[in-house]
């Protein structure tokens, strides 16, 4: 079984798949859990990329789930075969969460993955102003060390190419203790200088100018997204600055088809965006911010409790930094449950 000739990206197939998915949307059943999660995520859209090693899902099933099969060269086998990656259309709200629930079941039943695979999360409807971009970049640099303790060591030090590197300190906005006391001119200068450094990093060596800027959204590196080195960090700002769909991509997660892990990761990353949006004064003035602080601030202690428990469980699981990824891990992924919500 196969899909014939596939492309390496999903953009061209999104309109068709979205149209078919929407024609089935009245049949999507929403549970109380789906509704609760969607309320926490608010107005953000979300799309996921599930890398696999083996498996096949027929088009009638894919279309109902808003899934698009693509090729991923990073997964190429020694035989030359390129396994499939399954990419969702942009999803939103309780029906989007319900769809992820259904996708989780189908992927678990029909696909397998290994250590070379990942799950990537795109979140859309995010702010695009310079203040947010600077705040988000600095926040992710602040939490990345703690975030990596929730994943096995191979995500930090893979054998081959690292597709989810840590953000470099060179491009991070400086901590500024008197942020609240800056006048408008000082604030504009701080944000502008910070943004220009981030733009230089994301554009792979260009400061904003007439040819390359936020309005024309042209990336200096042409000839395929895989040539853009700034994509391959634990958070990817390239689509936010240079693509029409304006999303942030979170690339760190290990491969999974487990709905508990998917939902928790979506809530954790959404919380990062909310915190960077509403509390830039805290981001710019503090050198240390914990994930627990962020979750409590964004969701409130009662709603955050289960997500914090999940984070602690992940840290405990990988405290010995076990690197193997065999049948034990695949079975754990299939059967893992935690009443987070």
Where are the language model's segments positioned?
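C-terminal accessory/tail domains of diverse enzymes
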Residues: 2-114, 126-341
């Amino acid at each position: 079984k196969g899909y014939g000739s596939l492309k390496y990206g999903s953009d061209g197939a999104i309109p068709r798949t979205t149209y078919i998915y929407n024609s089935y949307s009245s049949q999507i059943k929403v549970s109380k859990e789906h509704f609760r999660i969607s309320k926490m995520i608010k107005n953000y859209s979300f799309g996921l990329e599930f890398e696999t090693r083996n498996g096949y899902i027929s088009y009638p099933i894919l279309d109902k789930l808003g899934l698009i099969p693509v090729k991923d060269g990073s997964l190429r086998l020694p035989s030359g075969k390129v396994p499939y990656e399954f990419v969702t259309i942009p999803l939103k709200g309780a029906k989007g969460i319900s769809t992820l629930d259904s996708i989780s079941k189908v992927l678990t039943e029909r696909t397998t993955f290994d250590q070379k695979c990942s799950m990537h999360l795109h979140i859309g409807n995010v702010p695009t102003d310079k203040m947010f971009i600077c705040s988000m970049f600095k926040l992710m640099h602040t939490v990345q060390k703690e975030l990596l303790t929730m994943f096995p060591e191979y995500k930090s030090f893979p054998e081959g190419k690292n597709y989810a590197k840590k953000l470099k300190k060179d491009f991070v906005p400086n901590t500024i203790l008197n942020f609240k006391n800056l006048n408008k001119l000082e604030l504009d200068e701080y944000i502008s200088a910070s943004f220009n450094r981030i733009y230089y990093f994301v554009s792979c060596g260009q400061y904003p100018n007439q040819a390359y800027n936020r309005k024309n959204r042209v990336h200096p590196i042409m000839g395929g997204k895989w040539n853009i080195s700034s994509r391959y960090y634990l958070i990817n700002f390239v689509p936010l600055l240079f693509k029409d769909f304006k999303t942030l991509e979170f690339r760190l997660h290990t491969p999974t088809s487990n709905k508990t892990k998917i939902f928790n990761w979506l809530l954790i990353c959404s919380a990062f965006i909310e915190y960077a949006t509403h509390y830039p004064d805290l981001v710019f003035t503090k050198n240390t911010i914990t994930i627990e602080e962020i979750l409590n601030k964004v969701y409130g202690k009662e709603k955050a409790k289960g997500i914090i428990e999940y984070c602690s469980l992940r840290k405990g699981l990988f405290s010995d930094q076990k690197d193997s990824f065999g049948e034990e891990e695949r079975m754990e992924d299939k059967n893992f449950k935690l009443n987070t919500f």
